[in-house]
Amino acid sequence: MKITREKFGTLSSGKKVFLYTLKAGELRLSITSLGAAWTSLRVPSRKTGRVDDVLLGFDTLDGYAHNQAAVGVTVGRFANRIGGACFSMNGKQYSLFKNDGAHSLHGGRRGFSKLLWKSEAYEEKDGVFVRFELNSPDGDEGYPGRLKAAVSYGLTKSNELVVDYQAKLDAPCPVNLTNHAYFNLAGEGEGDILSHELMLHASSFLEVDQTLIPTGKIVPVAGTPFDFKRRKPIKRDFDAVAGGYDHCFVVDGEAGTLRPCAEVFEETSGRTMRVFTTQPGVQFYSGNHIIELQGKAGSVYRIHDGFCLETQHFPDAPNKAAFPSAIFGPERDYHEKALFAFMW
């Protein structure tokens, strides 16, 4: 196991940005302190004999400083959408920054993804990790209360990428942290992901309106294009979903326990990724808005060249009383976990 840290660049403010590279098992993960973003994940393939980077991303700090597609970043205070960019809590209405039409997406104008996180690497018996910390002041992007976030990303000897999200607050506030990594198990720059085979441990999903805000209705997946209970190519029912997949699925089992969430298989490389989460939902996004994005080593990413599996609380939960509560505060700390296991 090994951890290295190097300077990734300098922001216009003069602050240094670091790039950490973790090695454990047969995986190698790189993460930058700007946006606590995953920049690279190298995974071997017995079938091809190659070790490929399976994450979309950028070669330079400038790519992450102007990252409009949220590539690889840690998202907060509230991942996904809040309808109308507002919510009411304890008799008071809070207005948020509108950055998705009439709605607030991924925390607002900058959220946590364009901020510089405090970072520290450490090693334990079974793995190597980086802990990122961030303080969000009262009123940040319109959200109430002071929040201290602590996110750990690491690799284990068992070829697992492990994730730990924590937040403490001095006042009640919606919280929903996730990572917005774009995967392509064939290797970044190797074309679209529509032939990847996906299975979701989800018997239902959240119905959404035309602007992707949940209606409040939880719909069984059986007999719909959203049925991934058995592994199938992403493209099989793709044409029946206008614009592609960008939907939250309700993960089977008890929220709060680490349980299977998703499995993805890519035939050319023979790679499989299994995802586990403690959260109630997972957003499956099929890269519908990747448009001529300049990526690594001269690659140009296009529509559907990567997919996201964003473990999270339900979108618009602050406005949907029937959804699991995403309000945390002094008497309820936020703490969620995820795990990505790789096989080849």
PLM regions and their residue ranges:
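An exposed, glycine/acidic-rich loop-and-rim segment of catalytic or binding clefts
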Residues: 1-344
